[in-house]
Structure formats: structure tokens, C-alpha cells
Amino acid sequence: MRMTVIPIVILCGVLSVVYAVWTTKSVLDADQGNERMREIAGYIREGAQAYLTRQYLTIAIVGLIVAVLAWYLLSAIAAIGFVIGAVLSGVAGFVGMHVSVRANLRTAQAASHSLGAGLDIAFKSGAITGMLVAGLALLGVSIYYFVLTSVLGHPPGSRAVIDALVSLGFGASLISIFARLGGGIFTKGADVGGDLVGKVEAGIPEDDPRNPATIADNVGDNVGDCAGMAADLFETYAVSVVATMVLAAIFFAGTPILESAMVYPLAICGACILTSIAGTFFVKLGTNNSIMGALYKGLIATGVFSVAGLAVATYATVGWGTIGTVAGMEITGTNLFFCGLVGLVVTALIVVITEYYTGTNKRPVNSIAQASVTGHGTNVIQGLAVSLESTALPAIVIVGGIIGTYQLGGLFGTGIAVTAMLGLAGMIVALDAFGPVTDNAGGIAEMAGLDPDVRKATDALDAVGNTTKAVTKGYAIGSAGLGALVLFAAYANDLSYFAANGDTYPYFKDIGEISFSLANPYVVAGLLFGGLIPYLFGGIAMTAVGKAASAIVEEVRRQFREKPGIMAGTEKPDYGRAVDLLTKAAIREMVIPSLLPVLAPLVVYFGVLLISGSKASAFAALGASLLGVIINGLFVAISMTSGGGAWDNAKKSFEDGFIDKDGVRHVKGSEAHKASVTGDTVGDPYKDTAGPAVNPAIKITNIVALLLLAVLAH
């Protein structure tokens, strides 16, 4: 089985990378526009590459220490797995950003010809990042699994293979949390600081070249939404596939179906890469000029093709009949196929729900715009109300997904649903990475003084880009929540396995019964401790953005004060100073909060062990803390990302001209618009820093707990 399916899976991963290379050539061959556009894009490119180089250097230092620890505490193959996960995650983000900072001016230039041409370049740029994320993640896991089992000769379900693959997921997780948090602090420090002085104090429009923070804002779009999201979804993809393979190794140990069950998630991802590539060719602007409609055509085509891909993957690996029993439940290939379908349906519903809560001209966004008419305070109140309300429907969908898949295929069925969800990652990341390119294109059009019709086209693309970014975050959080649940299942089952084999693993000998009962005070304590982590983490992230934004406010005011010619247009702002200031702030502020979810499981386990003297109580508290992180993290992340997206598009409503309930039209520069800018400055760090960074924090706590078990077993 492995000998036939794995090479095909690897070939699918290679095709994804080949598609990305071919599309890169197509994007880079497009017209770059006039000299002024090239000059502005050059500033953005230099700033983004300088920031990312410094960020990766910082991560490399931390990563090197962790790799040495993995080698010492686990094994050489675990350390190599960690390095593979970290390096490939970094490469996906770096190459994606490398293309996006070159596609921005080409999109602006293409938009000067037609809206469709602008959409084509921006989407292709996003598709490059998307296919690299899916392709490199699949190649990393499948090739390393093949090497471990076929070249090094480890049995597929052995602890050596499981530990090495979990370490690969940990490598991706560590990059992800740093990239998400660091990129988020940079981008929102620039955005909020620049808006407060530029729009509110000086009364100049967004992306005005007189604002010294403008270039930093455009740099931030790339390092946050392109490189950051790429690392985030790479990690979710790799971690969820690995977790599902770990469950297969536990549930089907010693049965003939073991290898097929472990390869099944890889086969699903391989098939879905092909369907995602096919889906990209359906993104074309129709006669109604609906940009969202064009993007949805591609997403719907990918989803429909993925049903067939899922069927082929199921038939080629586990077949349609009975494959074994999980927790006394008979599992069939047909049931697992339906679990995959549930994953695709959950994805579709989360996309639709998130678009409803963040899309322009929808009730939630209109309610915030209407609240802006009566002032700043009412805007913030209504924005918070929408952010809280937006958690209900996604949570109900996720609950339905969990129960439905558990009834069909047990916890392994839930893992297959998450794998099918992440099979669509190539197309979903393409929709997300489309956002920063269109945002930058609008900035370049404004700064280069292009025709107002060009700015109108880029604004239309950017408004959709805001929604696609929010939709992608909803998808990333939903899949992360389900993925973390699969990781928790792996933790609980690993724990049972070690406890049942105490003679082989002496640390776990005679530890007694491990109970997750709520009557156990250590379980309740663990739940509460885990529950506080997303809030504390989010609070630290918001504080970091506030500090960075304050520094930018001071810097922009200083430049306006010391260079009066800037506002008159006779002096050039010092763009590099703001970029450098933010780079230092983001790198400095990202390290401590990033270590919080890494260290939390260790604090819980060893803290409870020290207090209670019972290993069973410590493991129960640790397991409960993982559930606390998953549940609270899910709600915190959804409320922040959807609420922030709604605030942003409420502000956009005024830029297009918002007609309130009394029929009065409010435009850019009006008092209502100023109130919406205040809401947007609150929503920005909500949706682009704290909310998205909670996502990898949820998974990293679960992975560290899994690795802790492996270390103790050694």
C-alpha cells in the first residue's frame, strides 16, 4: 500500500510547487507600471524583506535551542523532524511574501486597464502562496514518513515514527506563532499609529504619501497577512495531518489496515491539492463584475472536485468496507468518506457565516456603520456586540461537525474531517494572500497619483480582500479548533497507551487511574488555567500593538513638526525610520507571549505534580488545561477576527458613501466616518494580531503536551 500511494502523494506535492513556480513566472512577466510606482514598491519590498530577515534570525536562534533539546530529550530523527517543519514553514511564508511584494504594483498597473486584469494578477499571487503552503506541508510530512518507514526501516506505527512526525508539527508551530504575532504587531502598529495621526489628526486620506507611516503600513500587510497566514495554515495543515496519523497508529495498532489508515490522510491531501489547482482556473470575473462571485466560483469548484478526490483517496487506501473497530465502534471506509464530506460542509458553512458577519452591505457591518452616526462610543459598543454575536453560529457548526463525525467514525472520523477541511488550504490561502496584494495595490495607486478610476478599482478589490482575509481567519480558527481536539484525543490515547504499558515505559508504571471527571479538583483547576491562556495571550498581544502604535504616533508627529514641508508636499517623509522602529518593536514584543503557550503545559504538569505528589492528578490537570485552551481560544479568536473584520468594513462603507436609516448620506471625512475610524483602530489589532495569534497558541499547547509524554516515556 505505502509503495503505491506514497509516491503518488509526493507527486501531488511536487505538482503544487511546480504550479507555484509557473504562476510566479506569469505574475513577474506582467507590466510594472511607471517609475514612481516602481520606486514606491521598492520601498515596500525592502522594508518587508528587512523585517522578515530579522524575524527569521530571531526564530532561528530559538529554533536551534529547541532542536538541540529535541535531539537530547527524544532522538536525532525527532530533532530532524522539528527542523524540517520549521524550515518548510519559513520557506512557504518567505517565498509567498517575495511574490506578493512584487505583485502589488503589477496589480495596480493591471487595474488601470480593467478590474478583471487587476483581479487576475492579485489572485494568481495569492494562489502561489496557497499552493506552496499545501505543497510544502504535504511534501514535508509524506517524504519524512516515507524515509522513516521505507529507508530507515521503522515500523509505521512505532513510537519513533510518531515522535518524529509530532516534532515536525512542533517545528511548524513554533514558526507559526512567532510569524503570526510578530507580523501582527508590526502591521497593526503601523496601521493604527498611521491612522490616528494621518486620518484623525492631520485629516489626510489613507495611503497618502505625506504620511511617514504609509510605507510601514504596506510592509505590514505583507509580513502579517501573507507570511503570517502562510505560516499559520502551514502549521494547521501539518499538525492536523500528523495528529490524524497518530490516531490511526493508536487505533489500528497491530491490524493489517494500520499502514493504509496512516496513509489515508496524506492521500486526501494529495487529491485535494489537484482539485485546488483545478479550482484556480475557475476564478474569472463575470459579466456582473462581482469580485467575490469570481473568487467563490473557484472555491465552489474546488469543493465539488474535492468530493470526487475524497472518494478516490478512500478507495485507493482503506476501501469502502469495514476496516476495524474504534472504542467498540465498527469503522467502514464509507463512513470515513462521509466524515470527509462533513469536513467540506463545515468549511463551506464557516466561509458563508464569516462572510455574513464581515461583508459590506450585510446586517452586522451596516449596524456598526449606523452606530457610527451617533458617535465614537456607540460604534465601539456595536462593534463589540457584533464580535460577541459572531461566535455563536461557527461554534454550533463545529459542535455539529464533532458529533456527526464521531457518530460516523469515532475520533479518527473527526481527524479525517479536519484533514478534508485542510485539503482546501491551497485555495483558502490563495483567497487570503489576495488581500495584502490588493491593499498594497491601492496604496501604490494613491501614492503614485494614478487616475481616480484606478483607485476605485483597487478599492473594490481591497474591500473584497478584507472579507476574504476575515473568511480565511474564520476557516483557520475553525480547522485549528477541530485540529486541536484531534491533538487532545491523541494526548488522551497516548496517555492510556503509556499507562497500560508501564513495564516498557517505567515512568508510567503504577500511576493509577487517570480521571478527567469534573469531580476531580485538579481537572477543574486545569480547565481554569487553560482557559486563562487565550485571554492573557490576547491581552499581551493587544498591549504590544498599543506600544508599537504609540511609538509610531510620536514618530509621525515628530516628522510633521520638524519637517513642515511634508504637509506642503515640498519635503519627503523618512519612511525608513518608521519601518525600522516597528521592526525592533515587533521582534522585541513577540518573544515573551510566544513562549507562554509553549511553557504553560510544563507549568501545569510539574506544578500539579509538585503540589499533589500524584502523576495521575498532574496528567489529568494537563489534559483539562488543553481543553480549556481549545474552548476559550476558539471563542476569543472568532470574536476578535470577525469583530475586527466587521469594524474595518464598516469604515469602508463610509468611503463608498453610507446612507443611514433616515436616508442621510455620510461620506469620507464626515463625523460618522471619523467615528468608524476609531472603531477600526480598535478592530485592527483584534483581527490582525491578537485573534489570529491565538490560533497557533491553541495547537502549540497541545503539541507540547504530546511531546512531554514522549519525553517522559523516554
Curated annotation (Swiss-Prot):
Protein residues bound to Ca(2+): D648, D680, D684
InterPro entries tied to this protein: PPase-energised_H-pump (IPR004131)
Coiled-coil intervals, chain numbering: none
Keyword Magnesium: yes
Binding of Mg(2+) 1, residues: D191, D195
Enzyme Commission designation: 7.1.3.1
Site (Determinant of potassium independence) residue list: K469
Transmembrane segment boundaries: 52-74, 85-105, 128-148, 166-186, 238-258, 263-283, 298-318, 333-353, 383-403, 411-431, 470-490, 522-542, 591-611, 618-638, 693-713
Annotated Pfam families: H_PPase
Source organism of the structure: Agrobacterium fabrum (strain C58 / ATCC 33970) (Agrobacterium tumefaciens (strain C58))
Recorded GO CC terms: acidocalcisome membrane; plasma membrane
Protein name as catalogued: K(+)-insensitive pyrophosphate-energized proton pump
Record key words, sorted: Calcium, Hydrogen ion transport, Ion transport, Magnesium, Membrane, Metal-binding, Signal, Translocase, Transmembrane, Transmembrane helix, Transport
Job description of the protein: Proton pump that utilizes the energy of pyrophosphate hydrolysis as the driving force for proton movement across the membrane. Generates a proton motive force.
Binding positions for Mg(2+) 2 per the UniProt entry: N218, D221, D439
